[in-house]
Amino acid sequence: MNRRLALQALGCLMLQSAPARADDTPALDALRSGGVLLLRHALTEPGIGDPPGFRLDDCSTQRNLSAAGRAQARAAGEALRARDVTVGAVCSSAWCRCIDTAKEMFPELQVAVLPALNSFFAGQGDRERQTSALRQWITALDGGRRVALVTHQVNVLALTGDNLAMGEAVVVQPDRRGGVRTAGRLAL
């Protein structure tokens, strides 16, 4: 009887620890047909926002990727390549944690800074202007060009309404009204 209970308990634990994986086929299909991969930067050192007095031109003054975040970004890039998904360009916020996420995920590409991706957390930047500029940038893309954009939680939320954890991604596409819609989430 004890052995049976132990096996049942072990089975329950195994079921609980099995990762749930959503069907990301719609997102992958959208990305392959020219969708935009919109990512929140990978895991960082503990904290919220950046330290007082941080500077964009000095990574040592910012909250940066942790070792786990660098590994997470590399694994995400490898997961995309394993699914035969490539991107032709990668753009990033000017924050080091976003640039480093992009470099770790896509080491073969040059990372271009796109100011519309810069954080507007805690009153920095201009939420409405940047979100509008990003929406226009995405809708102006050539439909067959696959692009990855690395940014911050507030930017993704403002553009799509999706609240992503660090390292999560959505695929977005222009809609028929001049806006942007989420085609799906990707488990990277």
Place the predicted regions along the sequence by residue:
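Short, surface-exposed amphipathic charged segments that create phosphate/polyanion-binding patches used
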Residues: G125-A133
